């Protein structure tokens, strides 16, 4: 089954607060943020863009690695997410721009950024337009580092295949919804292509003038307890369809009761490192 995406609801205060609370209490976004920041060549960076930066989880990771004189610009179209970020992350090196990722080049000078980092969001955008905007604002030699959920990229880490010992929490949610509410999940489409495979990414990056210099399929290890907390965030709550949030939380609680809290849950990611070619000598 194609993974459920979360496109709408990011600019609602209740969601922004729940999302930020999750990032503070659980390691999931902190871990992926630090992984991307580590790959972004930030030791001598002057300007770094946190693209689709939300409430600032990735900005925190970037700020820990850049020099004291450097700047971070966090760009996101959800003002609610940025309001939470402004309240909770007050580093003077960080500024916020409320804008769609596709309009990034409207807000930064050409060839001004040393790196652009995008965590857990690129597949929600018009990637061809975003890649072109990133290429416009990156300096020659600058890096663009992002990740794509394995279900959207069509990849799975070996740990994702071997760690599971029973039904996933998502599968149990669908089961409970079917039994208690007559829910019928969307039909499986085994032949459906992934939304954003590496081949498509590479073609679009090349068209934008960027070169793929590294890729890796990674595994993020968590627990059923962390997965439950993540699924409590309104934009991620399941199942899809005509349910209230309260109903979804009741379904989640019933499904979670059928699991072991510390049972392993593994998420696959495709990490991509691209670079704007250096100017010819």
Predicted feature residues:
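Conserved class I S-adenosyl-L-methionine
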Residues: 1-43, 57-61, 81, 145-178
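Class I SAM-dependent methyltransferase SAM/SAH-binding core
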Residues: 47-51, 55-104
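A short acidic, Gly/Pro-enriched loop at the edge of an enzyme's catalytic core
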Residues: 106-116
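A short SAM/SAH-binding and catalytic strip from SAM-dependent methyltransferases
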Residues: 114-128
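A short glycine-rich, Lys/Arg-flanked "PGG" loop and its adjoining helix->strand segment in the class I
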Residues: 129-140
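Short alpha-helix
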Residues: 192-208
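C-terminal helical/coil "lid" or tail adjacent to the Rossmann-like core of SAM-dependent
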Residues: 213-263
